[in-house]
């Protein structure tokens, strides 16, 4: 094949079939991908583990399953163990007879066989289904400077920004191919130049901005560009502690889903901003000022996709991306306190908190698990988005504090404080 980038002798050998026809096809795909984006060469994937975005066994994805079979048969397995996005189903999550038929017979009817394929390709274990693979409890936490082959947008933006790893916003399958060959094309966010900020965002709010709305505003403004955010340290500090990481997790997911951000820098907080400061800002960077009025404008312009905009919510999802352990504890305390204040013992709207299986396991080993269960809240490991993809679920009035879930589904966004108020008061 004709290609523009420079390949090492070892890479050329793989491309020419030296490690089998299947590996040659995988390498050819990566070379074509890199050429399309102007990559000059391939660079090694240096992270200990990979992560895949496609976790759901949709019946219509037969070409994907055929491809997986070809990879397995050809010995083109992942060179690194990997985690994968959350599973789509959990019997504990509120559903209906008809919804379950759609889920199991028409939508995710290939889940078991696909799970088996993932295990053969290199899945870490059955607890490794989460969009927040970087959580300490999960153990797939890249080091600063690690080159990754990931695709899940919320994980990519977190790894790039909060951990200082290097990864492009790859597509599903491409990220698996990078893990198989152990190389990715050198372009975009993998390069020094590609990590320069072309936007300066000045946060000038009078109170701590809601992570989901701030991220949404920035994502919609800068799209796929890199923003350098000033003024946020006033509200979330200059230490990357558990609180700041949880805030940035949700903030980043909103920038990535409401826009296409793959990397952001937070002045005085994120690793590269601490080390390099404003030298990360490219010449001619645009400026976006965010004040209280701008955040209100953004939130007030979210469309309501419900047929009846005044309907009583039938379901609430909290945890997209998956909640951290500290967030689970905080939500449990807040729900219990709010119920007590309102003279109630149970939530008024079916509510599901989602977190990584390993985080759920840790939480369930504490007294807080019984407290949360007593309120009626369901704790699950699923992907709320995969649940909402059911056409019957999409017709329901569902509420969430996730801007990502709002963007991709018919669910309605409320702030965390608003969600807490809604689910702990008498349903109207």
Spans of features found by a protein language model:
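Non-transmembrane, aqueous-exposed alpha-helical and coiled segments at domain scale
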Residues: 1-428
